[in-house]
Amino acid sequence: MQRVSFEVKDTEAEKSSSEILSGSLPSTYRNPAMENVGNAVDDGSSVKNNPKLDMQKQNGLVKWFKKCLTMVSGESKAPRLDRSKSTAGQALKGLKIISKTDGNAAWTVVEKRYLKITANTDGLLLRSKFGECIGMNSKEFALELFDALARKSHLKGDVITETELKKFWEQINDKSFDSRLITFFDLMDKDSDGRLTEDEVREIIKLSSSANHLSCIQNKADEYAAMIMEELDPDHMGYIMMESLKKLLLQAETKSVSTDINSEERKELSDMLTESLKPTRDPNHLRRWYCQLRFFVLDSWQRVWVIALWLTIMAILFAYKYIQYKNRAVYEVLGPCVCLAKGAAETLKLNMALILLPVCRNTITWLRNKTRLGVFVPFDDNLNFHKVIAVGIAIGVAIHSVSHLACDFPLLIAATPAEYMPLGKFFGEEQPKRYLHFVKSTEGITGLVMVFLMVIAFTLAMPWFRRGKLEKKLPGPLKKLASFNAFWYTHHLFVIVYILLVLHGYYIYLNKEWYKKTTWMYLAVPVALYAYERLIRAFRSSIRTVKVLKMAAYPGKVLTLQMSKPTNFKYMSGQYMFVNCPAVSPFEWHPFSITSTPQDDYLSVHIKALGDWTEAIQGVFSEVSKPPPVGDMLNGANSPRFPKIMIDGPYGAPAQDYKKYEVVLLIGLGIGATPMISIIKDIINNTETKEQLSQMEKGSPQEQQGNKETFKTRRAYFYWVTKEQGTFDWFKNIMNEIAERDKSKVIELHNHCTSVYEEGDVRSALIRMLQSLNYAKNGLDIVAGTRVMSHFARPNWKNVYKQIAMDHPGANVGVFYCGAPVLTKELRQLALEFTHKTSTRFSFHKENF
């Protein structure tokens, strides 16, 4: 819908341009009446005081005055827009520009610009200066916006007053949905006929879906345009009225933002929660610090006592060795340096033993599943404790090395013969004269090599290297160091480190009796346990070579594998297993959440290409078989060349404890939805089993009681947040299955696509309307392609917690999050806040990848 513009050339005005610039009227308007008008204006009196001025001459004066303003501004004519551009496209782009304006920008700022710009135009703002006045960088859109606002206000001409400018400004900065929608249609309706053809509707759909990165809707623009025309043009007139489309959009948006609050009591509860959640600050510093400490201890008491015990044991060992060597003759020569070195060495022995325990996954899984130690021991923090111990080792190595290299050895070289004599039985009868004597000794070589290997392993274990964050910054040959592979292989250098540690401890200075060489005593049990676990993994993987039954390739570089399930492979939803593909690397094992349920007769994993190994395994599978259409499975029977896959597990994870809670909040970010998918399927299975048991007349009470104790979940909320529309294809069939089987409405599903502008934004209003129409007609969501309606933009997590707290007062809610660390802090903080300020207790569990 384009507006046809006619440009009428005013030759008289051109001829009299010099007269205009000189301040005199053109001859066309020179007559006695107009002379009087001119005098009146010069005198500052009102034009209305001249009774001889008729309406025709007044209009002529206005036209002449506008031309004067145009000439004064240095423009012979107003700039014209490129009408070849899409009207809907300009409108959508314009909404983006408007959204960037600061609604809180003081009107006084705009007013100052207005006064400055109109200083020479008698308080009238030119159309060409509108963008500059309101602070809009896009001059082209500023002109378009001016025209739209002028049409809406029934203003004609290219100038406005301050009052009209203020009215325009208020409409621009009204960010309500209704106002934005009105502005959108005002921008489109350039000829003010209020009509849209099917082609224009199709164009709007394509542009809106493109702006929201929804290729699925863009590809079906013809179908959706026909659906809108069928809805709004039942008489087949060939066009629809904008007002009708506007009402439909408003209706869809009203439904999307409506809430379930249907009673005054619930509204009052919501207000009370909002009031209680307002931040308060105690003026008493001591009381405030005490409250913060108390809340921290209550929320993290498991971590607190474990860390406190660890620090206490280290302090005792350090103090014991310090005092022991302070009372020996060597203290007279080496002083506190030897005490520091020996104290640090004792903590090193402890930590080198402890650091293996958190990665003994089979042992931890057994303790988690078979004992009640999980009540006191934070098994979920095993890797965090592993990292904390690593920091303790680094500190101990630094103190021990510096004390020996920078203090003890120089003091021994500088000691007098009399001072050295008592130490001869430990360092040799002949006093060393060179520093190299200590460096090239067995103790020195083993110690330095250990430090060197530890530095390599510790450095490449840092997140910047392990997650590949530095890959782009490193030069070509070093890029491979910033990868999970480099971390995995260099961590196996600790096999050498432990061998050297035993040798270093055996040839230790100042101790000759075997029973005083305690390094092997510290390491014996943890090393044996860890070695046993690695042997178990090797044995299990050799007999658990699974067959790939099906595979599927999905958008977003996700590979799904369905594998045969070994006979004795028993697991719980939320757990994970290690996967090895010899065709990629015979040594590398990578953990993946199990997306199938314990009741399924197969195992499934979803592998997203996030690193070198995951990209490699996708490449291997794509080479041996032609990639299937998106979401279609390839059967292993028809493709026997699938690569060999080995598995090891299952292993415990935080999400497996969901059955302990009556209410669970499951949050998956991107591929982090994988453990949650298994859980919600398991909830459906357990719910159906529970209903069947309750309906059975036979069966022992003990069996029913046992099922009640193992499965407590009565309500589940699942939030899946992803930025790509194609991601929903990963679990499309599962979502449809859950929506169909969940007869009791136990699970509340929420899919959020963050590429779409938030609900309430006009740029996504058309998508919301199409979503509502298509769901009502076909029962499918146009974004996800499932029976579950999708939401736009990121969830308001505070509102999510608030709604759950309102619906389940006094309940213990388990919050399980899997995804990138970006959300961890916010979700944990909200769990603490609502736990402290409401009757609902939220227990937060995370699983980052």
UniProtKB/Swiss-Prot annotation:
Gene3D superfamilies: EF-hand, Nucleotide-binding domain of ferredoxin-NADP reductase (FNR) module, Translation factors. It is an enzyme of class 1 (oxidoreductase). Coiled coil: none annotated. Residues 1-303, 410-444, 511-518, 681-849 are cytoplasmic. Residues 176-211, 220-255 form the EF-hand domain. GO terms for molecular function: calcium ion binding; oxidoreductase activity, acting on NAD(P)H, oxygen as acceptor; peroxidase activity. The modification Phosphoserine is found at residue 270. Ca(2+) binds at residues 189, 191, 193, 195, 200. Keywords: Calcium, FAD, Flavoprotein, Membrane, Metal-binding, NADP, Oxidoreductase, Peroxidase, Phosphoprotein, Repeat, Transmembrane, Transmembrane helix. The chain crosses the membrane at residues 304-324, 393-409, 445-465, 490-510, 519-536, 660-680. Residues 541-657 form the FAD-binding FR-type domain. It is a multi-pass membrane protein. Its EC number is 1.11.1.-, 1.6.3.-. Residues 1-17 have a biased composition (Basic and acidic residues). GO terms for cellular component: cytosolic ribosome; membrane; plant-type vacuole. Pfam families: FAD_binding_8, Ferric_reduct, NAD_binding_6, NADPH_Ox. Residues 342-502 form the Ferric oxidoreductase domain. Residues 1-53 are annotated as: Disordered. This is Putative respiratory burst oxidase homolog protein G. The lineage of its organism: Eukaryota, Viridiplantae, Streptophyta, Embryophyta, Tracheophyta.
